[in-house]
Design a protein with these regions (language model features):
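The feature marks the mature, well-folded catalytic cores of soluble enzymes
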Residues: 1-130
Length: 130
């Protein structure tokens, strides 16, 4: 049997950026008994069960609803983005919001919002390389 290894491996730029932002939030917050704030993600930060389990073990809370955000929390918006209304509700909660949305996803979200606001119909196709 021939085994071929992919030329590239690992996380895409957007996921790497989201994980970096989460690490920075954890580092800024302290750890263990000295943690200052609750660190949360709204939904899973990325789609990787092993990574999610490792952050949960470090005390990161995965919110399943925007209603779970509290004033004083630090809440990261996941790499794959959230609907604009969910982001607005999170910001109204009094939590510190860190937008970890992939820049490519955010660009698409803004294009969609601008197109639909002007009454245009929108057909969206994905990036074949992502």
């Amino acid at each position: 049997m021939e085994v071929k290894r992919a030329g590239t491996a690992g996380f895409c730029m957007g996921v790497s950026l989201a994980l970096h932002k989460l690490e920075m939030a954890i580092e800024a917050n302290g750890s263990g008994g000295s943690a200052l704030r609750r660190i949360c993600t709204y939904g899973p930060i990325i789609h990787n069960p092993q990574v999610l389990a490792s952050y949960e073990a470090r005390g990161v809370v995965c919110l399943k609803s925007v209603d779970g955000a509290r004033a004083g929390d630090t809440v990261l918006i996941r790499a794959h983005g959230v609907p604009m209304q969910a982001e607005a509700t999170l910001r109204e909660s009094g939590a510190e919001i860190i937008d970890a949305t992939c820049p490519r996803v955010k660009k698409a979200q803004l294009a969609i919002a601008n197109s639909t606001a002007s009454g245009s119909s929108l057909l969206l196709f994905g990036d074949a390389d992502h």
